[in-house]
Amino acid sequence: MLPVWSAMVLFAAVQEQMFSTFVEQGTAMERHIGSFEIPAASFQCVDTIAVIMLVPVYERVLVPVFRRFTGRPNGITTPQRIGIGLFFSMSAMVSAALVESSRLQIAQAEGLVHRKVAVPMSILWQGPQYFLLGVAEVFSNVGLTEFFYDESPDAMRSLCMAFSLLNVSAGNYLSSFILSLMPVFTAGGGSPGWIPDNLNEGHLDRFYLMMAGLSLLNIFIFAFCAMRYKCKKAS
């Protein structure tokens, strides 16, 4: 069970970007719709809306479809559900990298690279990356909870369920650690680094691509462990 839990630590680190680098990215984008200014942090509601919308869709639509092909009551196994969530998590990082790459190109074209100002690119372009993280939550977070409930010994079920939530804290620490390393390894020699105070001078897109690469590696490791894991109960 520990390898499955470990895979979710990086997943939680990716999810944490929604509260840190996504907000910074949004602050450096055009946030006005008419006279109304969208707070950059408020876009986290897209993730919440995605979860609210997709949980019933998964249970009422996807599970019956999966069940036809697999013959399993829950459609797919919990490791498979977690794996799908890990894939969408990686996709969110790729989406964020594409948005940031476009934002930097616009900053270059408008001569805003050395000015700490918002770039004329709508914050609405961030929508897909938040939505993809919501999809990832529906699959991986719920899948992890089901996995620990089904696979833990009866006498340790409460402890294992609590342990399953520890990945969120571990992921936040991992994210903070990775971000703290960015100035060390990416700044210097006249370069402001990937994530400077002025994002127009940085390369936040490279950070997102790095997280996507780590997520892809995480998927392969998780798949290797999951294929060798024998479920205690039919999922």
What are these model-predicted stretches?
Residues M1-S235:
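Hydrophobic transmembrane alpha-helices of multi-pass solute transporters/permeases
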